[in-house]
Regions:
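N-terminal glycine-rich "phosphate-gripper" loop used for MgATP/nucleotide binding
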Residues: 76-91
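N-terminal glycine-rich anion-binding loop in soluble enzyme alpha/beta folds
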Residues: 1-60, 136-153
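Glycine-rich, highly charged phosphate/nucleotide-binding loops
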Residues: 55-74
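Conserved beta-strand elements of the Class I
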Residues: 5, 119-124
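Metal-dependent catalytic neighborhoods of phosphoester/phosphodiester hydrolases
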Residues: 52-53, 91-97
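Short, acidic/small-residue loops that bind anionic groups at enzyme active sites
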Residues: 30-33, 94-114, 148-150
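Secondary-structure junction motif
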Residues: 128-136
Length: 153
């Protein structure tokens, strides 16, 4: 079985949500609640991520995330995920510098929207995620409308 690595801690609540979902889906697939998946979580400091973003230091953010994924590589993982939307602004740069597949939350969300034949999708996230086009652009290019709430909403 392939080994998953997750960059978590972005915030801790989403890491817990991912963890519980992974366990639930794994047990569903195996057909038993008497087993748990083995995988690695590298919990990083979300406030460091926010600092890089506030300083518009995307190179620093890239380096920080590359280091996080490389630790998962060294642990023996076969692929990785980042458990938050906002860090995906540097997804391509990170993927280009690591040796294992890094699944994109943006591309996976778009694939699910296509699978369900959805043309209009709502996005709720950090202000940064909702203001920048790294999430919106792939949807627009695929003919999907990504709806973002107004600031007062």
């Amino acid at each position: 079985m392939k080994e998953l690595g997750m960059v978590g801690g972005l915030g801790p609540e989403s890491t817990v949500e991912y963890y519980q979902t992974i366990i639930s889906k794994y047990q569903e697939r195996i057909g038993s609640k008497e087993t748990l998946p083995e995988f690695f979580i590298n919990s990083i400091n979300m406030y460091q991520v926010f600092e890089f973003i506030e300083q518009d230091n995307l190179d620093g953010l890239t380096d920080y995330l590359v280091d996080a994924v490389q630790k998962l590589e060294k642990a023996g993982t076969d692929f990785a995920i980042i458990s938050a939307n906002t860090p995906h602004i540097v997804y391509d740069q990170v993927q280009n510098r690591v040796h294992i597949p890094l699944y994109s939350i943006v591309e996976e969300t778009l694939a699910k929207a296509k699978e369900k034949d959805l043309d209009k999708i709502g996005l709720i996230g950090t202000k940064f995620t909702m203001e920048h086009d790294f999430f919106k652009k792939p949807f627009t290019l695929s003919g999907k409308e990504l709806v973002v709430p107004m600031e007062d909403e």
